[in-house]
Amino acid sequence: SIRLDSTLQAPVTSFGTPAPPEWNLNVMRAPELWSIGHSGAGVVVANMDTGVDSAHPDLAAQWRGGDNSWYDPHGEHATPHDSDGHGTQTMAIMVGGGVGGTAIGMAPDASWIAVKMYNDAGEATYSDIHLAFQWLLDPDGDLNTVDAPDVVNASWGLIGTAGQRITEFSADIEALKTSGIAVAFAAGNDGPAPLTSLSPANNPQVLSAGAVDAALAIAS
């Protein structure tokens, strides 16, 4: 079928001072998980975002490395790059180590790969996103190797879709799940009222992640 190849804008990135020790990890009881050996070792996490700064001290050692660990459908960067910062932030929340300070990710011993879904202008077409999903199924294009990620994170959503279920990427997501890959989407920034999560996060196929603040109030 023929459909409009819509364009998606990159999420807004917030910048601040170096982070203090992360209260959220204690709320989620991450130290208890680490103490029994669940720190992400042996797990590969993929990020669909604005890219990743692979030189970041808390992420450099965790990059899996190689041609099967980075994909830029726009052809702008042959190696990991992030001209925005959003993808580096979300990756650090997941797998950041403690080298650069006191902050640390939820799974600091996991390794990462990434798709630079948005171009340097902060835009991604639907066709770019479909290509990204396809790459994640078989990063090196060789069915005889096992190099797909264990988890895919997508901290983006289709703006203006709160309360609507858009199925544009349902087949892509289902293909990942059928391959044994866990898929997580950010619920979006339209909360905290009911029925404000965005698509694809509000699709039943995915794990949808929201947020709370330090007082455990639901974030926007």
What is each model feature region?
Residues 7, 118, 189:
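Residue-level "edge-of-site" marker
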